[in-house]
Structure formats: structure tokens, C-alpha cells
Amino acid sequence: MIDSIVGTIQEVFNNYVILNYNNIYIKIFCNSTKFSEFLGKEKRVYVSLKFNENLSELECYGFLTREERELFLKLQKVTGVGSKLALQILSSIDYQQLIVEIAKGNVARLEKVKGIGKKTASRIILELKETLKKEFKVASTSGTEEKTYEKLEEISLALLSLGYEIDEINQVLSSEDFSELSLEDGIKLALKKLSKI
């Protein structure tokens, strides 16, 4: 299975780019707005290969980070969400912000994405909310009190909304004891630690 491809972003179109890999030109469906910043430049693209609906053609979907690709794959596990709609969602909402919105249960925000109604938005939140909350924050131990667990969750979501990477957040939250701190002080401490990474 191909994990990623390094090549030059040769051309940018509405919902895909052409990537030049050793003079082999690959069509990659993606968030073309993000990829347009790298037109003419060499870039590593994390890919996911999928057969189209007719099973007649293998399509390549590309992302700038491994985390965004993983979220793309998770979205497709939701009933009624295929590759095209999953990409549409990630092209409309930054993947880190999308994690926050799903974790918060923000149906209204998801409904704003073209092609998503209330039913699909609700299903996405129902099926992914707990999974994302567990995966994109430090896991609690058996002795951790519920209040501390919730506090770490809120700190994680706050830092995600500020644009910090998930791996960095987990590193900081697992290296400090936040149990005696208020939410505000916890966020301040986390930001201080993140500035040193």
C-alpha cells in the first residue's frame, strides 16, 4: 500500500492537482486551495487510493498531513459518507477545527457543508464524537477523576482550535499534572510548554 508520494505540484484545478512524480503525472483529488500554495514546488502528499463508484477506475486522494488523511478515512466509515463527500467536508472545514466541532457536537456547523443535511451531520457526530475525543487527547488512567478527565478534554479542544498539532498537544498533556489547575491556568501552562517544543 502506498503511504505517500513526493513530487512537484504541476497544475491545480478545482478539486484536484496534477503531481509530477519522476515524469509520471498523477491526478490527486484534494483541497486544491491548500495545495495551490505549493504550485511548482516539491511536496510530500499523503495518499489514499479508492475505486470509484463503478469500480472502473482507481482514484487517488491526497492530504498534506497524515492526521488529515486519517480523519478522511474515519469519515468514510460513517453511513452515507463516501470519498467525495468526506473530501468536501475537509475542504470546507480545516481538519483540526472539524475535530473540535465534532467533539462539541456542533450539528449546525456541519450542516453548512454542501451536500450535508441535518441527518448526515447528526450521524457523523453520533458515530465519531467519542472516537475522536478519545483519540485526539491524552487518555485518562483508571485513577483519574472525572473532573480532571473533562478538564484535559477541554484543554485539548482549546489548543486544537488555536491550530496546534495533535501530537504536540498529547505530548504536553501527558508530561504535566493538570489536576490541581483551573482550566484557564491549565491552558496557560500548556501554551507555555508548547512554545518550547
From Swiss-Prot:
Cited CDD domains: UBA_RuvA_C
Region annotated Flexible linker, chain positions = 144-152
Gene Ontology cellular-component annotations = cytoplasm; Holliday junction helicase complex; Holliday junction resolvase complex
Query: According to its UniProt entry, what is the function of this protein?
Result: The RuvA-RuvB-RuvC complex processes Holliday junction (HJ) DNA during genetic recombination and DNA repair, while the RuvA-RuvB complex plays an important role in the rescue of blocked DNA replication forks via replication fork reversal (RFR). RuvA specifically binds to HJ cruciform DNA, conferring on it an open structure. The RuvB hexamer acts as an ATP-dependent pump, pulling dsDNA into and through the RuvAB complex. HJ branch migration allows RuvC to scan DNA until it finds its consensus sequence, where it cleaves and resolves the cruciform DNA.
Q: What is this protein called?
A: Holliday junction branch migration complex subunit RuvA
Query: What gene name is given for the protein in this entry?
Result: ruvA
Swiss-Prot/TrEMBL keywords = Cytoplasm, DNA damage, DNA recombination, DNA repair, DNA-binding
| One BP term from GO | DNA recombination
Q: Which residues form a coiled coil?
A: none
**Entry's InterPro entries?**
DNA_helicase_Holl-junc_RuvA_I, Hlx-hairpin-Hlx_DNA-bd_motif, NA-bd_OB-fold, RuvA, RuvA_2-like, RuvA_C, RuvA_C_sf
HAMAP family named among the record's database cross-references: DNA_HJ_migration_RuvA
Q: Where is this region: Domain II?
A: 65-143
Task: Cite the domain annotation text.
Answer: Has three domains with a flexible linker between the domains II and III and assumes an 'L' shape. Domain III is highly mobile and contacts RuvB.
**Could you state a single Gene Ontology molecular function term?**
four-way junction helicase activity
Renumbered residue ranges of the record's region Domain III: 152-197
Q: Where is this region: Domain I?
A: 1-64
Where does this polypeptide localize? Cytoplasm
